[in-house]
Swiss-Prot record:
Signal peptide: 1-17
Glycan-bearing residues: N18, N45, N217, N317, N499, N522, N760, N783
Name recorded for this polypeptide: Envelope glycoprotein H
Its membrane topology: Single-pass type I membrane protein
GO cellular component: host cell endosome membrane; host cell plasma membrane; membrane; viral envelope; virion membrane
InterPro entries per the UniProt record, alphabetical: Herpes_gH, Herpes_glycoH_C, Herpes_glycoH_C_sf
Family recorded in the similarity comment: Belongs to the herpesviridae glycoprotein H family.
GO biological process: fusion of virus membrane with host plasma membrane; symbiont entry into host cell
Functional description taken from the UniProt entry: The heterodimer glycoprotein H-glycoprotein L is required for the fusion of viral and plasma membranes leading to virus entry into the host cell. Following initial binding to host receptor, membrane fusion is mediated by the fusion machinery composed of gB and the heterodimer gH/gL. May also be involved in the fusion between the virion envelope and the outer nuclear membrane during virion morphogenesis.
Compartments where located: Virion membrane; Host cell membrane; Host endosome membrane
Length: 841
């Protein structure tokens, strides 16, 4: 329990002879008493010894009774932590200026004037303001700052931080600006008062709206910094953002010329980044306030802003270099795209360390600070230029949702179900924009649902749908996402790479179909997710993985954050949405290394900046991005392939699989190198014993294990059949070394014909002539049957004459037998009573 007592310290000297105790008068409520002796007093600290303890408290009358003359400059607050059984404990001391005892009311206009000039500031928008009887003062009476711990590093000499080289200068007061430059409002344009769109054209062109709401609707608020370590701040509030999970929290408050970003992590100490105009000074609450006021830690003020960084994370979580970097963020640029570009870069690099959670802590703080600063930069840019753009609002909303998920899941190690984010920005109303978007999607005529628009338009529509989604996606948005993924899948069957627009469209389509939080009981959404995972895994062939990794390496090698924006959607790959975890195996890393010379610019950069071992390490980390993104997201796995977790099976949870292939509902193929504990198990022959491949067919209802026999037959040729005989089956190509190369779902009759064409196939994985003798293939049927793919029987053209009549009848008989065999494999091959026949639907 805690007890609080206020007494007066007579300065400059306290002696035993002139001790003064304050006793409640009869007029005041009886609150008990405490006696304390001041044993030592020095220029640096005070020490108190507890001689007696009784329950105590304080009220307004008692506090007012302490209001002495002007010669008494300070009062002290005694905070006692006492064991309720032994009445023994520790005593702490906090010094408060005496003027706090007199309520002081902040004088300000109810409405702030619009700033004068392009980058004008309001007159003193951020002002230190405190009153002992103000509700915001309560945190200072309950804080542990200076009692149980100190929020700042113990040595004030280290509070002054150097200004980073990237911080703003007098010649460059607003930092860098990316290309293309921010559009300006055309002459004679009448600006809307708020962001909205009534047609899809609003996404294709620049739509401007006024920033006047940021001034007319701003409210005066009080902010109490971290642990009450700095006196309260009044500011004109223009918005807030809250990102939370079970292991991390980022709270951002934005105002006119003001930002507070409180970043906390369950495994680390919290920090707070505060930005004020360069003319504003904040005062820290320290034990030295008797003699002089200290500014909180931070660099010298810049040409526009002053930055402070609070928290013991200053000297415990970070290196000095990292601390200086974070303090520079708000002054590096007022272009929000710059900060988001840096956040994406850090997030991508963080995924290469996803198996080493203790290393992600610093990345977590950096990304969180970048996210907060991007909101501040957009708010300030809009305020000072007096306008915003609709695409800026959509862009920021999608970035908040996506980066929050990556930040919390990979940076903080949070459970995905606990991740949430809310934004309340005065210059945009996501709820209103969501309703307008729903109306637009609702105007799509059913006859046009299957019509596929350009990838540019699809990307813009899906990006907006993802950004403004509130847990429920419009049925036509889901339909568009499905069509985009299927179209890209068909294209990747005959090529190895995607252009930037296709990658962006694929990113937003997959995010919509895979990452939903509401309606988990909706079987159609789960089916969408299973189909998406299967298609993404099928697109992630060995050849595509190599090209996608080269795209990422080029994106990072050529990264110039002062010119162009870098985002993860720009380098997105189906491998990042696949369920493959094997791409860090040596053969895939070596394939990437051998392909680097095919891109001369990248090859030159890598060999100029890195030695051979560093190049190999960079290649390995690039491939690790693919294995980390979706394949290790337990939320996605639990939602869409729950059968791999039944029967207390921890293999998937521990990542003990090479890949997962969803089959019919409730069943999946799992490929592993470990000994399976359940399921129908097939061991691929002629594979290196040190790198075995086991194909396991899992059912949600079966916990037993049984060995299956791989069929070795020539399959019937499907050319003369209208129906798709092999649709739903999966083609798997592997090497005798045990490496998995390609996984392709047979999705249509055209794909089936390409599979049967063998040496004439235009789909490279299907063509055996394009691979060596060490390449093998099997076909995985949806009912759990596995067949070695040797070839397809062709029925020859037969002349209808008596000489060949017998041969014709014999051929027909063989065809019937062949189709009977394949039908048995598709629907009737159940080796265990626990594995029932599964309809091919």
């Amino acid at each position: 329990m805690f007890a609080l007592v206020l007494a007066v310290v007579i300065l400059p000297l306290w002696t035993t002879a002139n001790k003064s105790y304050v006793t409640p008068t009869p007029a005041t409520r009886s609150i008990g008493h405490m006696s304390a002796l001041l044993r030592e007093y020095s220029d640096r600290n005070m020490s108190l010894k507890l001689e007696a303890f009784y329950p105590t408290g304080f009220d307004e009358e008692l506090i007012k009774s302490l209001h002495w003359g002007n010669d008494r400059k300070h009062v002290f607050l005694v905070i006692v932590k006492v064991n309720p059984t032994t009445h023994e404990g520790d005593v702490g001391l906090v010094i408060f200026p005496k003027y706090l005892l007199s309520p002081y009311h902040f004088k300000a206009e109810h409405r702030a004037p619009f700033p004068a000039g392009r980058f004008g500031f309001l007159s003193h928008p951020v002002t230190p303001d405190v009153s002992f009887f103000d509700s915001s003062f309560a945190p200072y009476l309950t804080t542990q700052h200076l009692v149980a711990f100190t929020t700042f590093p113990p040595n004030p000499l280290v509070w002054h931080l150097e200004r980073a080289e990237t911080a703003a200068t007098a010649e460059r007061p607003f930092g860098v600006s990316l290309l293309p430059a921010r559009p300006t409002v055309p002459k004679n344009t009448i600006l809307e008062h708020k962001a909205h769109f009534a047609t899809w054209d609003a996404l294709a062109r620049h739509t401007f709206f006024s920033a006047e709401a940021i001034i007319t609707n701003s409210t005066l608020r009080i902010h109490v910094p971290l642990f009450g370590s700095v006196w309260p701040i009044r500011y004109w509030a223009t918005g807030s953002v809250l990102l939370t999970s079970d292991s991390g929290r980022v709270e951002v408050n934005i105002g006119v010329g003001f930002m507070s970003s409180l970043i906390s992590l369950s495994s680390g100490l919290p920090i707070e980044l505060i930005v004020v105009p360069h003319t504003v000074k904040l005062n820290a609450v320290t034990s030295d306030t008797t003699w002089f006021q200290l500014n909180p830690p931070g660099p010298d003020p810049g040409p526009s802003y002053r930055v402070y960084l609070l928290g013991r994370g200053l000297d415990m979580n970070f290196s000095k270099h990292a601390t200086v970097d974070i303090c520079a963020y708000p002054e590096e640029s007022l272009d929000y795209r710059y900060h988001l570009s840096m956040a994406h870069t850090e997030a991508l690099r963080m995924t290469t360390k996803a198996d080493q959670h203790d290393i992600n802590e610093e990345s977590y703080y950096h990304i969180a600070a970048r996210i907060a600063t991007s909101i501040f930069a957009l708010s300030e840019m809009g305020r000072t230029t007096e306008y915003f753009l609709l695409d800026e609002i959509v862009d920021v909303q999608y970035q908040l949702k996506f980066l929050n998920y990556i930040l919390m899941r990979i940076g903080a190690g949070a459970h995905p179900n606990t991740i949430s984010g809310t934004s309340d920005l005065i210059f945009a109303d996501p709820s209103q924009l969501h309703d307008e978007l729903s109306l637009l999607f609702g105007q799509v005529k059913p006859a046009n649902v299957d019509y596929f628009i350009s990838y540019d338009e699809a990307r813009d529509q899906l990006k907006t749908a993802y950004a403004l989604s509130r847990g429920q996606d419009h049925v036509n948005a889901l339909s568009l996402a499905r069509r985009v993924i299927m179209s890209i899948y068909k294209g990747l069957l005959v090529k190895q790479n995607l252009n930037a627009t296709e990658r962006q469209a694929l990113f937003f389509a997959s995010m919509i179909l895979l990452n939903f939080r509401e309606g988990l009981e909706n079987s159609s959404r789960v089916l969408d997710g299973r189909t998406t995972l299967l298609l993404m895994t099928s697109m992630c062939t060995a050849a595509h993985a190599t090209q996608a990794a080269l795209n990422i390496q080029e994106g990072l090698a050529y990264l110039n954050p002062s010119k162009h924006m870098f985002t993860i959607p720009n380098v997105y790959s189906p491998c990042m949405g696949s369920l493959r975890t094997d791409l860090t195996e040596e053969i895939h890393v070596m394939n990437l290394l051998s392909a680097i010379p095919t891109r001369p610019g990248l090859n030159e950069v890598l060999h100029t900046q890195l030695d051979e071992s560093e190049i190999f390490d960079a290649a390995f980390k690039t491939m690790m991005i693919f294995t980390t993104w979706t394949a290790k997201d337990l939320h996605i796995l639990h939602t869409h392939v729950p059968e791999v977790f039944t029967c207390q099976d921890a293999a998937a949870r521990n990542g003990e699989y090479v890949l997962i292939l969803p089959a019919v509902q409730g069943h999946s193929y799992v490929i592993t190198r470990n000994k399976p504990q359940r399921g129908l198990v097939y061991s691929l022959a002629d594979v290196d014993v040190y790198n075995p491949i086991s194909v396991v067919y899992l059912s949600k209802d079966t916990c037993v294990s049984e060995h299956g026999v791989i069929e070795t037959v020539a399959l019937p040729h499907p050319d003369n059949l209208k129906e798709c005989l092999y649709c739903g089956s999966v083609f798997l190509r592997y090497l005798t070394t045990g490496a998995i190369m390609d996984i392709i779902i047979i999705d249509s009759k055209d794909t089936e014909r390409q599979l049967a064409a063998m040496g004439n196939s235009t789909i490279p994985p299907f063509n055996p002539d394009m691979h060596g003798d060490d390449s093998k293939a099997v076909l995985l049927f949806p009912n759990g049957t596995v067949v070695t793919l040797l070839g397809f029987e062709r029925r020859q053209a037969i002349r209808m004459s008596g000489q060949y009549l017998g041969a014709s009848l014999g051929g027909a008989f063989l065809a019937v037998v062949g189709f009977g065999i394949i039908g048995w494999m598709l629907c009737g091959n159940s080796r265990l009573r626990e594995y029932n026949k599964i309809p091919l639907t």
